[in-house]
Amino acid sequence: LRGLVGSEMCIRDSDDAVWEHLEAFKENDKIGNPELYPYPGMDGTISPTTLRYMKNTFEMGFLLDGAEVGKVVEVGGGYGGLCRVLSKVCEFDEYILIDLPEVSALQRKYLDQFPDLKDKVTCIPSTEYEEIKDVDLFISNYALSECDLPTQMAYYDKVITNSKYVYMIYNLSLIHI
């Protein structure tokens, strides 16, 4: 990840990088009143969701092995927490979130609380997105597994095929509901 505060740290010493940026990651929990818990070996408390976003962030750093990331597209970004956590260690130029219209409004409200992200992040309702080109990193944490096949194929054709790297977590089910 370009600008990943020492991308080698992410790859070789992710433990050190986690501790170095932990307080910045915890800022994710200052809005919205999430449930916070203490964890062994860590001062203070943190939400399980922020911990998962930290895990996702360092997995991406490991898999990308120092590649530059200017444009990120995330489908189904929830309230925008992964964007916030990733921004603490990755100097992306543009982050596009695509989600349901109501969720896009929530993302905008949450991410507008952080001045460093306000002008870098675009929240696009899934009913309005078009083809997006020159994507460095495409992210989907479970979102595509919640979509029907035609919707999945539309994302594939309009975004994934235009992406250098894809980080996807997908629930596989033998029965599509």
Spell out what each predicted region is.
Residues 68-78:
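Conserved class I S-adenosyl-L-methionine
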Residues 3-11:
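Short, small-residue-biased leader/transition segments that mark boundaries at the very start
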Residues 110-132:
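S-adenosyl-L-methionine
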Residues 163-173:
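Conserved beta-strand signature within the Rossmann-like core of class I S-adenosyl-L-methionine
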Residues 33-64:
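Class I SAM-dependent methyltransferase Rossmann-like catalytic core
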Residues 147-159:
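A short, conserved alpha-helix within the catalytic core of class I
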Residues 138-150:
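A short SAM/SAH-binding and catalytic strip from SAM-dependent methyltransferases
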Residues 80-90:
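Conserved SAM-binding loop of SAM-dependent methyltransferases across substrates and taxa
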